Amino acid sequence: MWKLIQILTIAVLVNGSYYSFNFAFWVSGPNTKMILALFGLLWFLYDSWRGGRGISIPHVLLGGAIFSILYSLVNLVAVEVNNTDDYSYANYITTFLVWAFSVYPAIRCIRIVHGEVTIPRIAYYLVGVTVFQCITGLLNDNFPAMQSFTDSIVFTAGEFYESIDRIRCFSVALDPAGVRFSLVLLLISAVVCTDTEVQKNRWIVFLLLISYILISVIGNMVARTTSTGMAMGLVLLLFRSNTIGFRIRKEMVQTMATFSLLLVVFSAAGVILYNTSEYFRGELSFAFEGFFNYFNKGEFTTGSTEVLQTMWRWPEDNKTWIIGSGWYGGFIYGTDIGYCRLILYSGLIGFVTFASSFVYYAYYFARKYPRYLWLFLFYLAMTFIVWLKVSTDILMIYVFFFWFTAEESDHINGIFPEATPELCE
């Protein structure tokens, strides 16, 4: 029982960072991510003091901080040069540090409870809270009492969501949900294909594959951005298992057979629900509108992609191309497209600086953990694909990899079988 409480506590900490929210009873207060970041910073300083070797900052944290400071300065210059008061990204260094330290409590608790932090363990908790978000989304959408209960805990713009008739999960919705779901789907595929210990445990593989399908289906009902991660996750799964070459790796034969069987079962269930439930017919039609349009009209299009095609906005003078207009918030340019909003805010200088930081993260982790090379390459691709629709970034997933100890990093690379806690390298 005590172990279950510990695991649930870690899940709450992971959810509070990855799917952060404001409390309904403290709307003007800090969100859960900020609270955890403060707690994480204090815990990090305590661990550094207890280690007796001073403050040991992870190399990737230092590198990310440098990029964040540079990006903040560029945005500050854009605001000052254009004489605006839109400081949306001018304090990005603060955003970076909040993200980085908000996961520290969860990582430390994983180390305390399980003995060491591994990529599969991070995946288990992220998958768990993501499935929780998806299930609560369906419950909220079908049971007003459940939605009222959620609203008593989490502050959301309820009237807005009701006006657009979209599913709200426990603490995330729309494109922010779709991006986060996509990142978790890629992580599932990478862990299933890469970690030999996971592959040996058929029960864990079974649960991960079921979770993959659930997140894909319900996630697309919440936000069709999820389809990006779903498609990329499938490509990663098929590629890494060598299914594409019709010579499936021996250790992946049973995994792919299980996945194929689950796809058949869930597809059959989907067909039944589509034909017997008006609610699920509407949600599935929305979730997979592109596929329905392809089979019915011969074109893979959705209403949202057609709207996005009308949203391309670019600078109209050299100054804006170089340093931007200093305007980001307020939907001033009438576009959601990430590339447009970022370039219009601080020009190509700002955009290149911002994009370079995510190239750095992918490069750093791909070199540090070569077994997971393809995961980080796909995360890099995801960074630039997401900006075709929204301007959010994917820092929230990278920060979970910031805090491995040297021994844990060796274990991830298959060098040592066990890890002992020490300060992060």
Please annotate each region the language model reported.
Residues F286, G290-G334, L348-G350:
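TM-adjacent membrane-interface loops and short helices in multi-pass inner/ER membrane proteins
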Residues P120-S148, V172-M221, S227-R240:
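Alpha-helical transmembrane segments of multi-pass inner-membrane proteins
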Residues I57-A65, L97, P105-Q147:
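Interfacial loop-to-transmembrane-helix boundary motif in multi-pass membrane proteins
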Residues L186-V191, A231-L237, L375-F384, S391-E425:
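Transmembrane alpha-helices of multi-pass inner-membrane enzymes
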Residues W2-F21, A37-F101, A381-T383:
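N-terminal hydrophobic segments of proteins, predominantly signal-anchor/transmembrane helices
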